[in-house]
Amino acid sequence: MRAVWITTNWGLDWPSRPVKVLSDRYIQQKELCYILDELQSVGINTVFFQARIRGEVFYSSRYEPWAAVLSHGQEPGYDPLAFVIEECHKRAIECHAWLVTFPVGSNRQVKKQGRSSVVARHRSWCKQLSGEWFLDPGNPAVKDYLRALVGEVVSKYDVDGIHLDYVRYPDNAMKFPDSDSFRKWGSRSKSLFRWREDNITGIVTAIYEEVKRLKPWVKVSSSPLGRYASLEGFPAEWSCMEAVSQNPKDWLQSGRHDFIVPMMYFREENYYPFLYDWANSCPPGKVISGLGVYRLDKSEGNWPFIEIKRQIETTRKMGVGQAYFRYENLHTHTILRQWLVSCFYRYPALTPGLKNPISQIPDTPNNLRVEAQGGVSNISWSPADGAFTYVLYATNDSLDMNTGDQIVAVLPKNIHSCSLSIPYRNYAIVARDRYGTESEPVFWTGKNVEPDKYRITL
């Protein structure tokens, strides 16, 4: 996985202006298309689009108001989540709805939202800490609310994933004012800390089950803190288990998550030991390292580029994916983008798949044809039922579809032809469904070859 967070909170990555007049809507859409074009050009295959910020959303919802930064809380004239999903899929990029879970706004934000705020509508569900409002994870009604909120997104939109943010207790959690909730819904057999951990895990479980009930191919993930717990010789006071009652390893191991993206915005001894801990204690392919490319900015740490470069190199060697926080920082650091294009992401990559519960594979995209014309190879094939994307392989050597360096294109389901400026001797194509299950391949080696004569274990 090669992912980027597109942050909408405060319009940090998008939008640059709210919708006031009709032309603003088209400006917002044009900005999103520019962002996605750039991400496609550097090899990104997954977008985490921030669809819910603090009690406000970027889609049509029966539960929460339109975001002020989008359109001053009014209907903007289009649906940004539907738009970004469609544009991502045109580029064969996965779009995951990034949802902030428990924070619902500062005092100022809640006051500005007025009667439409979560706090005004459900005051008994909310707690205040240090001038910020939060849904109380210990209140059973909050679990039902978040499950319904996520269910609405999955039901209405063609998302590829649900990405949960802030699915934990707040910083300075020991001061979180939930003693009344603990007395009402807690258990004498559990400590406050264990009760809180169970609250978070229960909400994660409810969301996961709701997503899979509605659309089992939709992936469920979250961005936990970057360090699970202190390691011997490497203390980490601000960690999942020691600070915020968050147990993402358990979510993975018990089948309540499809992958996690720890926010590993650290370096040296605060990064590498914890990366190895995540990778060695979680199922293979289920950890995506969140990389803090914002740390390259002078005001955010002024890291030398070599720090991020080493982290990318290490995660690639370990088979761990990368997610970059956030788009604007990736956009402004030209050297990083150049390295992605010329070195790290020279070849397209396939996002991790899911187990297909119906054990069905897509049809084969038959009639693969390659025609050379003026130094360009024009390639075409027939549509395949069940395809969500097509994966094209090409090489001048023997085809080996078990390695990624022969992938030359990943194309959306409505595209059945493409052109390559570099000619190859051998080609193969497969259809891939929403679970990542691949069809039988079709080959071209100067003439079409029947797939069962060259069966490859994928």
Give the positions of each predicted feature.
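Beta-strand-rich modules
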Residues: 418-439
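Aromatic-lined carbohydrate-binding/catalytic grooves of carbohydrate-active enzymes
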Residues: 42-76
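Active-site-adjacent "subsite" loops/lids of carbohydrate-active enzymes
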Residues: 5-30, 86, 96-97, 102-156
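Polysaccharide-binding and catalytic clefts of secreted carbohydrate-active enzymes
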Residues: 38, 44-45, 52, 82, ...
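Pro/Thr/Ser/Gly-rich low-complexity, intrinsically disordered linker/stalk tracts
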Residues: 338-386, 435-458
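Active-site clefts of carbohydrate-active enzymes
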Residues: 8, 218-237, 275-308
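The substrate-binding groove and active-site-proximal loops of carbohydrate-active enzymes
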Residues: 11-26, 63-78, 129-144, 189-200, ...
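Substrate-binding cleft of secreted/luminal carbohydrate-active enzymes
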Residues: 248-271, 283-358
